[in-house]
Each structure stands twice: as structure tokens, then as C-alpha cells.
């Protein structure tokens, strides 16, 4: 998978891309792992858009792909190449 965010291309699995984005946060230690970061993104997504953001049960990869899709819908990033 390949996504474009703020002029930077991120490549990898959905979970790997979310980990890359987590590392770019102001304080990556605030989110101890990728799954925690995804849940925080979800909370911010709902608060800022007023839209629902359902994430699937299961592993981090499925959650990451769903979150990337939601972020793509609002233009927060662009999916250049699907998984």
C-alpha cells in the first residue's frame, strides 16, 4: 500500500503506515503502540468531522486499513496504491 500525506509518501502494510504516522506525531510516546494511535485518530476523526468511524474487530492491520480509508474520504491523505 502507498499513501501520500502532506507531500510525503508512506509505503507498507496498513499497520506499517500507521506506525510511520505515529512516529511523526509530536510525542510518539503518548501513543505506546500503533493500535492506541489508531484509536486516538478515530476519536479525533469523529470529533473534527462529526462523522461516524467504525473500526473492525480483529487485528491491527484491519483497523489500520479501515482508518486509512476513512482518512482518505475526508482528504487527510491520499491512497496512491491499495493494499
Q: Model features per residue range: what roles?
A:
Residues 24-53:
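Acidic, aromatic-enriched beta-alpha/helix-loop junctions
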Residues 14-18, 34-42, 61-67:
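Short amphipathic alpha-helical segments that mediate assembly, nucleic-acid/protein binding
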Residues 5, 10-12, 48, 56, ...:
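Intrinsically disordered, low-complexity segments enriched in small/polar residues
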Residues 3, 38, 79-80:
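Extended aliphatic helical segments
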Residues 55-83:
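Short, compact, well-ordered microdomains
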Residues 1-35:
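N-terminal acidic leader/helix
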Amino acid at each position: 500500500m502507498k499513501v501520500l500525506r502532506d507531500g510525503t509518501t508512506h509505503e507498507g502494510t496498513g499497520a506499517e503506515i500507521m506506525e510511520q504516522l505515529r512516529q511523526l506525531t509530536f510525542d510518539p510516546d503518548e501513543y505506546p503502540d500503533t493500535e492506541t494511535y489508531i484509536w486516538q485518530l478515530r476519536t479525533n476523526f469523529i470529533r473534527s468531522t462529526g462523522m461516524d468511524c467504525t473500526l473492525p474487530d480483529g487485528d491491527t492491520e484491519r483497523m489500520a486499513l479501515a482508518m486509512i480509508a476513512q482518512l482518505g474520504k475526508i482528504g487527510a491523505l491520499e491512497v496512491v496504491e491499495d493494499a
